[in-house]
Structures are given as C-alpha cells and as structure tokens.
Amino acid sequence: MNLNGCWNGDSKHSRTGKKCLNQLGLKATTTLSIPVIVVGNITVGGTGKTPFIIWLATELQTRGYRVGIISRGYGGKADNWPQHVDSSSDPQLDGDEPVLLARATGCLVVVAPDRVAAGQALIAKEQIDVILSDDGLQHYPLNRQLEIVVIDGERGFGNGLSLPAGPLREPKSRLVDVDIVIVNDGSWEHKGAFRTKIVAQPVYQIIGSRQKSLEGFRNTTVHAIAGIAHPSRFFDLLEAAGINVIRHPLPDHAKPDAATLAFGDDLPVFVTEKDAVKCQSICHENVWCVPVKLEFDAENGDRLIQSILTNL
C-alpha cells in the first residue's frame, strides 16, 4: 500500500490515521458474515442520516431483504452492552435514535459502543440478510461493503475546518472514497450525488388518536420543541407550512420533562419524532408529533436502490 496516499488529503486513497492503521494491518478489522452498509457523515450531526436509514430499511424490506440495524446508542445509560432494541425499549437506556429506528422500521436494532460487537450480537439473535450501521463511518474496525454519506445541502461543510475549529470529522477529500453521496435539501452540489428532501407527514397526538395534516395548522401559533442537532431545521419546516412557531430548542438528545411541555396556555405543542419517543409518559393531549420522511423523485430513488443492491 502507498503510505503517501494514505496520508495525502488529495489522494483518492486518503484516510484518517485510524483507517490507515486498519488498512496497514496494524489495527484489527472484522468482517461479518453478512453485508454491512454504513450510513454516516463527515460532519457533526444533523444531516438527515436517520430519515435516510428509515427510508433505506423500508425500501430493502419491500424487496424481500431481512434488515437489521446497529447503532452506538448515544446517550443511552444501560449498564451492559450490546443491548437489543425494539419498539418497546426505553430510550433512556438504549438511546433515542435506536428506539426511533426500531419503531419506524420494525427492524431489530442492536446498540453498543463497539459496532463489531453490535453486529455479532445482531447476527446471533436474528436471521438477517444485511446490516445497516447507523453512523460509524469513522468506526474502522468494522469492515463494510458499502459506505453512504449524507450531507446537509444547506450547511454543507460549514467553515471547512476539522473539529474542534469546524464541523468536519474527516477531510472533505474523504468523499472521493465513499460509494454513495446523498445531499439532503439545500443547494450544495457534489458530482454524482443523489438529491433528496425532507417532507413532513401528517401530525398525530402522542396521547390520543387524532391525526391532522400539517397544512391544517396553517396560521396557527404553536410551541415547537426540538432536541436535535439542528433545531432550526425543524422550526423552518413548520414555518414553511405557514405555521406561527414559538421556538424552544433543546440540546441534542435532551429528555423533555413535564415542565418542558407546559407553557401555561392552550396552544398546541409540536415535537420531533426523536423527542416523541422520550416524552410519551409525560405528554398532555395537546402535544403532537411531527413525523418526517425523505423523498427522492422516482427515477433517482430507483437508481439509488439499484446502485446499492449492485454493491452488496
């Protein structure tokens, strides 16, 4: 292997130091018995990765694939790992995103800081055909058949600097080496990328059975709570639908409490899907979840799935 290429940021073989060590055989890597698709990003948080994993898992399932998901379970406080996550799991123990993924896809999700251990536990538990790794692009001990990067098309790479001075986890040249690039909303361009957008779905009461289109709240004033990496994306989505939004951003992965949802008025309270999995036990009847999904145009969606299946 070319050592210069390993460290040269302009080379198509560029890698971070960790990946270089893996490629040189100086750090152990593990290949699981079934294909692994890593869905990640090269910037910190908030690119639309979770909605894309939900979309991809659903598309693969409709084609007959048995899908499992592994995740780090960020924010989870379980004493032992790996943890098996399903729709009834506690997001306080296992993390909010894994529980959301389990509920949205029906897939078994296994969480552990060590993604190799998570993958092995998943295979031991369930008959599956493919593993989707939620994040883990930089977790190089786990070999992968396919790397997919999701980029926020509105923010791109920010100031273009690496952590902690900027948002980059890895150099921009890392995109040369991944298999597929997804650009979510915005105008950021990348040659060969698949473009998508986030679309709101009908909102529903967390406690109760009512559903309502987002347009049904046009010109209504609502409290909006978002404990996600970039809350403004959620608030902007609501405002684009003609809703008057009182913004209440929370830190990413924060757990709302009863006081968080109480504003002393009778205005509706809107929360993200990720927040909804954490606050079901403390909601009042005027708390509504705003689910979202990714949409590709028909041609791009089909072409993307074929590209993925070809690489498995």
Protein language model regions, located:
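A transmembrane-helix-recognition feature enriched in membrane-embedded lipid enzymes
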Residues: M1-P35
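Walker A (P-loop) phosphate-binding motif
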Residues: Q23-S87
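Active-site regions of enzymes building and remodeling cell-envelope glycoconjugates
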Residues: I34, Q83-S87, C107, Q145-I148, ...
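Conserved beta-strand elements of the Class I
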Residues: G68-I70, V149, T221-I225
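Phosphate/Mg2+-binding loops and adjacent switch elements
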Residues: G73-K191
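A short, gly/pro- and small-residue-rich
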Residues: R144-G158, G166-E170, R195-P202, K278-A298
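C-terminal accessory "lid"/substrate-recognition subdomains
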Residues: G156-F270
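Short, flexible loop segments at boundaries between secondary-structure elements
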Residues: P251-K255, N286-L312
